[in-house]
């Protein structure tokens, strides 16, 4: 295993309270502290701080972000900091994903439908390959990292080291490539394939941009080269040694195949008999037919569609055992950094239950063996058990993070640019729309941008239409806007094609925009999850990357949440201004280049939500029960800080209340 040192490449040195935060975190890691928090305000350089921590402690690191877009931003930043080291990207590789599901009430089976992004698949494979052969690895991941993967032991065991001196026969190489799930294709040469032309074998590894060429004389290996897969030209000649890693993490080793097939057959027999005993003959027939087809495929080629549902057998685990995940590919001393932990931790908490509910229906109706339930994300307690030493990163850490960190909290309130938290002004809600229009025009004249947050989608859309009629360059952004369109809207704002974004929850990805000098919060006194202390502090922070940053709260009363958010912001402003005065710092706005496509890695669209069949309400009682049910769900989502989903359910609940008036 290679053991290169982590080395930061940057023109900057830690400044402000970055050095103190770095020293504190490093000391806690070296002293074996399991959990700690980096409480860093927006624009304080938290990523640079963590990069310095990694360089100081020299340990492999996993950084988990709450979504693909933020993960892509972090990946780009860490790649620049560590060009000599293995910085990898591990997120869901689906451009589109409709999970397999069964709706019993309508007897509807929905087959898994997905589109895999080849580039992201390559990056995922590069991540696991890097962990096998080197220690200087940083992997930036989304919560996909807590989903089951194939066994790392099988993955390691099946890699193919090829040495020019000792060689490997053509027949043996082909056999092992097929076992590693490489397909032979002598016509179209794509990633995860190999081709044979006479005495030449070309391999296109699943984790590389280039490929390898092995030239034989009979069965004697004469030369190993790295090639351009498009032109076939040699990029590097006379390589002494290469290693071919698997094309996927889900593998069936030949010496395990008999065991795997027998275990599946045994479980199939038991589960079919149970259905037959319960007089569920359709389910019994369905399960037998589907599983026997999969068994035939595994027997012939070591693989079948949906093989992840048999991952428990592949890994040799017992029912209910914790699945192998990306965590198992790391050495035991790895570090875990959870970015935007106030969002990411609740996400991790909720993953298991959502996945379980969908799969139970498939198992109960004979579409899958019970083993499919073990192809799952980690439970939260399993996630915590697998996590080694953890640093939670957030401007507003959740109660859980603060509690488990036991006062090991490093505050980072000073920005390298000297920018202080924005001034907050409270204005009455009367005439708020026209008052805000004046403020928008002032900012637009100075080529500055504005973010506006409302309480509902309807208000966001109506306000946008009203301002467009008055000549304002504005767009709205809410949960109906898909990931790619969100990215384009943000990019348009940064480039000045629009001056204003109006949205509901402006805490989501990509909204740390230096050009924004005003954040307006409409109806700030409507106490609720979108106007909680934590939400307000986060939203206020959106104006903290511009030296002219201001926040207007439109409110007629002072809520507890407003008071707490304003008090916290004033505390930070005081510390920041004192630091600037003492060090003679003149604040400067953050300068951030506008990428051509903002994030060229984020081709992906978030997983499509699975919708139940529409309910039919026959009386007022049915509607009232559904409203009560939704209220409980909303409360739970708010506790988990899943505001986007809470908003969707809140809107559903409002429609039901309108429907109730019609009875």
Curated annotation (Swiss-Prot):
GO terms for molecular function: ATP binding; ATP hydrolysis activity; DNA binding; excinuclease ABC activity. A motif (Beta-hairpin) lies at residues 93-116. It comes from the Bacteria. SMART domains: DEXDc, HELICc. It holds the Pfam family Helicase_C. Its main location: cytoplasm. Residues 27-414 form the Helicase ATP-binding domain. Residues 432-594 form the Helicase C-terminal domain. Keywords: ATP-binding, Cytoplasm, DNA damage, DNA excision, DNA repair, Excision nuclease, Nucleotide-binding, SOS response. The keyword Cytoplasm applies. The UvrABC repair system catalyzes the recognition and processing of DNA lesions. A damage recognition complex composed of 2 UvrA and 2 UvrB subunits scans DNA for abnormalities. Upon binding of the UvrA(2)B(2) complex to a putative damaged site, the DNA wraps around one UvrB monomer. DNA wrap is dependent on ATP binding by UvrB and probably causes local melting of the DNA helix, facilitating insertion of UvrB beta-hairpin between the DNA strands. Then UvrB probes one DNA strand for the presence of a lesion. Belongs to the UvrB family. The beta-hairpin motif is involved in DNA binding. This is UvrABC system protein B. It comes from Fusobacterium nucleatum subsp. nucleatum (strain ATCC 25586 / DSM 15643 / BCRC 10681 / CIP 101130 / JCM 8532 / KCTC 2640 / LMG 13131 / VPI 4355). The lineage of its organism: Bacteria, Fusobacteriati, Fusobacteriota, Fusobacteriia, Fusobacteriales. The gene is uvrB.
């Amino acid at each position: 295993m290679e053991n290169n040192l982590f080395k930061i490449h940057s023109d900057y040195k830690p400044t402000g309270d970055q050095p103190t935060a770095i020293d504190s975190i490093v000391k806690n890691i070296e002293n074996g502290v399991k959990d700690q928090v980096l409480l860093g305000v927006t624009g304080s350089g938290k990523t640079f701080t963590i990069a310095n921590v990694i360089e100081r402690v020299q340990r492999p690191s996993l950084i988990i972000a709450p979504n693909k877009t933020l993960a892509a931003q972090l990946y780009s930043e860490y790649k620049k900091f560590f060009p000599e080291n293995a910085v990898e990207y591990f997120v869901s590789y689906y451009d589109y994903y409709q999970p397999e599901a069964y709706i019993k009430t309508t007897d509807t089976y929905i087959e898994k439908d997905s589109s895999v992004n080849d580039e992201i698949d390559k990056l995922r494979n590069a991540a696991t390959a890097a962990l096998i052969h080197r220690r200087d690895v940083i992997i930036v991941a989304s919560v996909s990292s807590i989903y089951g993967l194939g066994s790392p032991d099988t993955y390691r065991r099946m890699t193919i080291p090829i040495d020019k001196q000792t060689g490997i026969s053509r027949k043996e190489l082909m056999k092992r490539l097929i076992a590693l799930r490489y397909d032979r294709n002598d016509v179209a040469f794509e990633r995860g394939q190999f081709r044979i032309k006479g005495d030449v074998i070309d391999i296109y590894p699943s984790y590389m941009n280039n490929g390898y060429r092995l030239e034989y004389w009979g069965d004697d290996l004469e030369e190993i080269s790295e090639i351009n897969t498009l032109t076939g030209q040699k990029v590097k000649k006379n390589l002494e040694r290469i290693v071919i890693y698997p094309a996927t993490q889900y593998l069936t080793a030949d010496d395990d195949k008999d065991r795997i097939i027998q275990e599946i057959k045994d479980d199939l027999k038991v589960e079919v008999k149970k259905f037959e005993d319960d007089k569920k003959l359709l389910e019994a027939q369905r399960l037998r037919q589907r599983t026997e087809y999969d068994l035939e495929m595994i027997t012939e080629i070591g693989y079948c569609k949906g093989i992840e549902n048999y991952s428990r057998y592949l890994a040799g685990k017992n029912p209910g055992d914790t699945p192998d995940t990306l965590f198992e590919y790391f050495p035991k001393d790895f570090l875990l950094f959870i970015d935007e932990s106030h969002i990411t931790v609740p996400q991790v908490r909720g993953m298991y239950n959502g996945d379980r509910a969908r799969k139970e229906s498939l198992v109960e109706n004979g579409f899958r063996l019970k083993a499919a339930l073990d192809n799952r994300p980690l439970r939260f307690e399993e996630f915590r058990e697998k996590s080694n030493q953890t640093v939670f990163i957030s401007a507003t850490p959740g109660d859980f993070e603060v509690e488990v960190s036991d006062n090991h909290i490093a505050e980072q309130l000073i920005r390298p640019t000297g920018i202080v938290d924005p001034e907050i002004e409270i204005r009455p809600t009367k005439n708020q729309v026209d008052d805000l229009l004046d403020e928008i025009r002032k900012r637009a004249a100075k080529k500055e941008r504005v973010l506006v947050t409302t309480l509902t989608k309807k208000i966001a859309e109506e306000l946008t239409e009203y301002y467009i009629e008055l000549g304002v360059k504005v767009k709205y952004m809410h949960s109906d806007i898909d990931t790619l369109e969100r990215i384009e809207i943000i990019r348009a704002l940064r480039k000045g094609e629009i001056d204003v974004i109006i949205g509901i929850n402006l805490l989501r990805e990509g909204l740390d925009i230096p050009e924004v000098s005003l954040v307006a919060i409409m109806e700030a006194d409507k106490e609720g999850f979108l106007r909680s202390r934590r939400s307000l502090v986060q939203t206020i922070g959106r104006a903290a990357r511009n030296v002219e940053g201001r926040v207007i709260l439109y409110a007629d009363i002072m809520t507890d949440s407003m008071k707490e958010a304003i008090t916290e912001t004033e505390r930070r402003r005081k510390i920041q201004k004192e630091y600037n005065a003492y060090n003679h710092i003149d604040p400067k706005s953050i300068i951030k280049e506008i990428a051509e496509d903002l994030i060229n890695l984020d081709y992906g669209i978030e997983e499509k939500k699975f919708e139940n069949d529409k309910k039919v309400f026959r009386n007022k009682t049915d509607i009232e029960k559904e409203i009560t049910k939704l209220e409980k769900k909303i409360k739970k989502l708010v506790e988990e800080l899943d505001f986007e989903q809470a908003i969707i359910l809140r809107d559903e609940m409002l429609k039901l209340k309108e429907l109730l008036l019609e009875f």
